[in-house]
């Protein structure tokens, strides 16, 4: 989030996008027809994606970041679970709210919801990440009904959605119709974090399939149980290789031995 800029509105976004064109990014795209315009840039052969936005009256990204930091301090398992599940959504093309996926904030809220429920039952014992992952996948993949239920983070509960929508003058459903996924925003009660998640059906199928893969893998020999969530030659392995080449060059190009000392 950029807090200050010298341009106005779309002008500032296009100015920055033009400047970034000179910095070696693989792809740069300005998305303007949203509540908060954003610049999306990718690098590393499309493996690394960054969103850039400008602070303004409608922008709540800084408040969101503060709240997420708070959740991470409260729930030890939130960070690793978010990394794994975010990568799963990246692989399935469901991580981008601008194309009907679930935002990172929305995913974090869902994970925090499950972790809170587990703490209510188990007390302050050390979190079992494997069990927490299974519970998340089972609840949001098989049990949660997005058409009839919403998630409240303020009250930490599932709540029923209205069974009927207001009618227009002709007796039909008035626009806009109900959002595809309801996740209350604890930083802004009037905002639904899941309002743009039109791929919620596919999202829940991904969680359900991941659960089956993890459960089945527990009774098999060899391989990573967690890795069964991801396909062969998958995106996450390409990310691992990119990180190794970027941050662990000695693994790919061993250091030359030091020259022998002169006699």
Regions found by a protein language model. Give the residues of each.
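Basic, alpha-helical interaction scaffolds
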Residues: 63-106
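Acidic, Ser/Thr-rich intrinsically disordered and amphipathic helical segments
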Residues: 11, 15, 38, 66, ...
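N-terminal regions immediately upstream of nucleotidyltransferase
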Residues: 4-12, 30, 55, 68-69, ...
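Conserved beta-strand elements of beta-rich interaction domains across eukaryotes
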Residues: 4-7, 44-47, 57-59, 78, ...
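Pol beta-like nucleotidyltransferase catalytic core
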Residues: 113-263
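Conserved catalytic core of two-metal-ion nucleotidyltransferases
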Residues: 13-59
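P-loop NTPase catalytic cores that bind/hydrolyze ATP
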Residues: 102-116
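Eukaryotic intrinsically disordered and solvent-exposed regulatory patches
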Residues: 24-27, 35-38, 93-99, 123-124
């Amino acid at each position: 989030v950029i807090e200050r800029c010298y341009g106005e509105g779309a002008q500032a976004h296009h100015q920055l996008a033009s400047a970034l064109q000179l910095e070696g990014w693989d792809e740069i795209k300005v998305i303007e027809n949203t509540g908060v315009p954003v610049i999306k840039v990718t690098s590393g052969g499309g493996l690394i994606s960054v969103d850039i936005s400008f602070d303004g009256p409608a922008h709540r990204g800084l408040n969101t970041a503060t709240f997420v930091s708070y959740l991470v301090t409260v729930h030890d398992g939130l960070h690793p679970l978010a990394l794994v599940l975010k990568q799963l959504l990246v692989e399935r093309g469901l991580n981008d709210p601008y194309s009907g996926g679930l935002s990172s904030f929305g995913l974090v809220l869902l994970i925090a919801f499950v972790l809170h429920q587990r703490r209510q039952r188990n007390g302050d014992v050390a979190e079992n990440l494997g069990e927490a992952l299974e519970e998340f996948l089972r609840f949001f993949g098989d049990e949660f009904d997005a058409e009839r239920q919403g998630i409240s983070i303020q009250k930490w509960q599932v709540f029923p959605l209205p069974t009927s929508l207001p009618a227009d003058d002709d007796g039909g459903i008035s626009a806009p119709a109900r959002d595809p996924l309801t996740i209350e925003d604890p930083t802004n009660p009037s905002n639904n974090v899941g309002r743009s998640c039109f791929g919620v059906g596919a999202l829940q199928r991904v969680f359900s399939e991941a659960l089956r893969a993890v459960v089945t893998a527990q009774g098999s020999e060899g391989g990573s149980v967690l890795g069964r969530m991801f396909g062969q030659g998958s995106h996450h392995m390409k990310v691992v290789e990119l990180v190794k080449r970027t941050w662990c060059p000695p693994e790919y190009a061993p250091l030359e031995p030091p020259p022998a000392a002169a006699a």
